Amino acid sequence: MEKGIIITLPHHDDTTEYLSQWSFEIIEKADEKSIKVKKLEGEEANKETFEKVVKKLDYNMLIFNGHGSDKLIYGHNNNIIIEEGINENLLKDRIVYARSCESASSLGDKSTKSAEGCFIGYDQPFMFYVDSNWISNPKKDKVAELFLSSSNQIS
């Protein structure tokens, strides 16, 4: 496995737009440390593209931004990217950070059983507050910064 990051950047609603915009801090830090980053942005944040990229690049870290549930992680337009019992094996032996509601409660547990990787996520809803005056420019939202900048530190 090669040192690198694959990161999903869907932006089909306010929540995913915020997550994606604030993820560019993570990408900048990785660039500063000469860590390779493959961005799956917008429509590229889908199951088919994700599976191809993971198999081709074999990077050791995966960062998901998007909605989720206890058994699913969604990409752009809420299309399923990872589904427990279907393709969670792609997470095995990797460092996974999922900013997706409840994805750690079952999917995270299953994907790390008898594996050397880890799954960092949330077993409750992942929530953050925003200043509605900045919906069209999330990076200037000082309220969201309190939540998302600290969330970026995990990666």
Feature annotation, model-predicted:
Residues 1-65, 97-98:
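A domain-level signal for caspase-like cysteine endopeptidase catalytic cores
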Residues 68-92:
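A short, glycine/acidic-enriched catalytic loop
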Residues 64-66, 94-101, 121-123:
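Short His-Asn-centered micro-motif
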